């Protein structure tokens, strides 16, 4: 980061290969990797496969809604299920707190002493009628008449820095949740602080992973440590039933160290994408997927259309993350860098799907409605550096954190002929955090909650210059 501050990111990219060569030649890198005869290296097994017994949840971090008071409390490993039950009780209205467990009583006393116990608000609205509710970033609730499944739950606390009538939705606002579906173990998709607010017997579906690695948390094991007792590992193309909702796991390609070959190709950011079908609609959730040496999300879309049919709604991450390997140093996935082979150091990588590719996928899958997501979308995200700003200070990095309107522009400018610019038949739905789809059919209706209205304008004007993306 100091190099970027002094010389600028453009110079970092140009100097990247030489800088990375110096790093690889250094003593500290040799502590994690062995050089090979071809000028590459092999990462040591103890790095590739961390000892799970040495890495366990040992501390609970708590803060009040405005982050002015905080508590860091040690939690002995055997007491996590008791602490989990306490958190559920504290975040649920009308539930009496059980103070009979010693560890729980001590934690409550510490929270009270630090002023961290606040009244729990009543649910914001009755959302049981909604087919789907978008909470922001990658979090979506899918409902049938009898069940509800939440994808990648990540809720943020209320805060005085946000508009008074536009605060983050909480789990208690969503009604009954029958199951959780997790795509991968990056912290903006696998948020234990949110998950601990759900009862211990909540069903959770996670990707199949035999062994925890440097790039992937084995969520099955970690969730059991926290007290969850109904966790299912689901392999690609397998399905589970949650009452009348069917959840099918699909391959997760992309968001790997490179979009081509990598060192230790078996060590991946392991994940699932999902096709979720209810009696009244269907949706697919592609999270941060894209393409890599093992496959391409567009191939997944083609097979899924044959095997499962077309989803009514396709939720696609569109961030692109077009970057050179040295830029990983300034990203949230710097740990990818040891897996990038030297011949790729000077080659730009496409880590995720771009806006234009999102429309490609929808056309291949024959999905009538495309929802851009997985890029923040509200102040509680962009204030921590996730996603573009969509308020009056609207700003974006088009190749890293673009406006969601970029997907609308991509759909409206698919090709150009002598008669003009031609659009896709795919309908792009721009959903804001708190929006719900409340009716099906060819023109679904988006409903915004009362007292939870989007307080900002639209960013379409900011991308009007992109009349044709090509």
Predicted feature residues:
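Metallo-beta-lactamase
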Residues: 104-127, 209-281, 414-434, 438-448
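Pre-active-site segment of Zn-dependent metallo-hydrolases
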Residues: 2-81, 110-127, 141-185, 192-197, ...
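Active-site-proximal beta-strand elements of phosphoester/diester hydrolases
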Residues: 131-134, 148-152, 246-253, 282-289
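Active-site-proximal loop/helix segments of hydrolase catalytic cores
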Residues: 193-194, 256-365
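Binuclear metal-ion centers of metallo-dependent hydrolases, dominated by the metallo-beta-lactamase
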Residues: 1-35, 224-243, 329-470
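Active-site environment of divalent metal-dependent phosphoester hydrolases
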Residues: 158, 186-190, 211-214, 235-241, ...
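Structural motif
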Residues: 147-149, 178-179, 203, 245, ...
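Short internal beta-strands
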Residues: 201-213, 315, 368-372
């Amino acid at each position: 980061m100091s190099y970027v501050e002094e010389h600028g990111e453009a110079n970092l990219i140009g100097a990247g290969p030489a800088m990375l060569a110096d790093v690889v030649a250094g003593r500290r890198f040799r502590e994690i990797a062995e050089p090979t005869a071809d000028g590459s290296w092999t990462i040591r097994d103890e790095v590739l496969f961390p000892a799970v017994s040495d890495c366990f949840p040992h501390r609970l971090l708590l803060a009040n809604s405005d982050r002015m008071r905080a508590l860091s409390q040690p939690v002995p490993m055997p007491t996590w299920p008791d602490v989990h039950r306490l958190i559920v009780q504290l975040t649920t209205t009308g539930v009496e707190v059980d103070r009979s467990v010693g560890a729980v009583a001590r934690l409550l006393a510490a929270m009270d002493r630090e002023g961290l116990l606040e009244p729990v608000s009543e649910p914001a609205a009755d959302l049981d009628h909604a087919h789907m509710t978008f909470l922001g970033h990658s979090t979506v609730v899918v409902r049938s008449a009898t069940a509800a499944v939440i994808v990648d739950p990540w809720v943020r606390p209320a805060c005085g820095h946000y508009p008074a009538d536009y605060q983050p939705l909480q789990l208690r606002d969503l009604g009954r949740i029958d199951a959780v579906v997790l795509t991968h173990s990056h912290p903006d998709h696998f948020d234990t602080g949110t998950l601990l607010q759900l009862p211990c017997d909540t069903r959770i579906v996670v990707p199949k992973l035999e062994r925890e690695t440097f790039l992937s948390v084995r969520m099955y094991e970690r969730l059991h440590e926290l007290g969850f007792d109904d966790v299912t590992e689901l392999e690609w193309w397998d399905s589970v039933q949650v009452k009348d909702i069917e959840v099918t796991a699909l391959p997760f390609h992309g968001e790997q160290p490179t979009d081509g070959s990598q060192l230790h190709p078996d060590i991946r950011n392991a994940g699932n994408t999902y096709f979720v079908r209810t009696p009244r609609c269907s949706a697919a959730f592609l999270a941060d997927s894209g393409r890599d040496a093992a496959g391409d999300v567009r191939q997944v879309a083609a097979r899924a259309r044959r095997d499962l049919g077309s989803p009514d709604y396709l939720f696609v991450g569109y961030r692109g993350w077009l970057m050179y390997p040295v830029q990983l140093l300034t990203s949230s996935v710097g740990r990818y860098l040891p897996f990038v082979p030297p011949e790729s150091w000077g080659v730009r990588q496409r880590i995720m799907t771009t806006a234009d590719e999102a429309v490609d996928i929808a056309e291949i899958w024959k999905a009538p409605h495309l929802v851009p997501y997985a890029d923040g979308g509200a102040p509680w995200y962009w204030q921590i550096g996730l996603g573009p700003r969509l308020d009056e200070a609207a700003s974006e990095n088009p190749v890293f954190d673009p406006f969601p309107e970029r997907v609308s522009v991509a759909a409206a400018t698919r090709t150009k002929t002598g008669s003009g610019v031609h659009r896709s038949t795919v309908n792009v739905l721009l959903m804001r955090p708190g929006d719900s789809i409340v009716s099906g059919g060819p023109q679904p209706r988006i409903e915004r909650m009362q007292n939870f209205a989007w307080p900002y304008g639209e960013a379409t004007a900011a991308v009007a210059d992109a009349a044709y993306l090509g």
